[in-house]
């Protein structure tokens, strides 16, 4: 595959702004039908909360229930099927109990292995997950995914604007997008940007990459709205 860096930026929000997608142009058919999995885990955690998110606090979609969920029905517009694994969401709350995270991760990886070999994986994430005893839960999820699918599989994820980035994440992901609005009215569009990049790269034989540079800037929540 041709190696090309799609994303050179300093924040997840800017990553989203620089995302390159296929758009509405007429595109050629795939040279061969790629195998693309979909999975993920999302939670917006406050590390100060004493209330732990347990397994029963997660809404978990498995198998074909993912494809029929309203958040992912747009996947039907692609000329390639997406292979479902597990998508878990705990919404906003306290830290995630380690045993809950480990259980979901183990099930996800088992479902992922059953689909091998894979050309791509789309990961529906949030970016602000905090798990007991871990400093980079998203990085752990991506690294575990990479170990299963191998170095040639393209991993693309979608994030919230304030999602956390680490070197571990950059080393294991190939593409990332984030909301461009706050409040978030572009949820579906954000997911589509991630899957558009993934399918575009597989169609044209492009291997995307992420370049990460930090900047010393912080914004309060009330200063980050795009609506006023």
Where do the PLM segments sit?
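N-terminal export signals
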Residues: 5-24
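C-terminal segment of N-terminal export signals and the immediately downstream linker at the start
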Residues: 20-38
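Short polar catalytic/cofactor-binding loops
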Residues: 40-49
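Short catalytic helix/loop segments, enriched in acidic residues and glycine
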Residues: 53-75
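Active-site histidine-anchored catalytic micro-motif
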Residues: 98-100, 105, 115-203
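Flexible, glycine/charged-enriched surface loops at secondary-structure junctions
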Residues: 205-214
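Hard-cation-handling environments
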Residues: 223-228
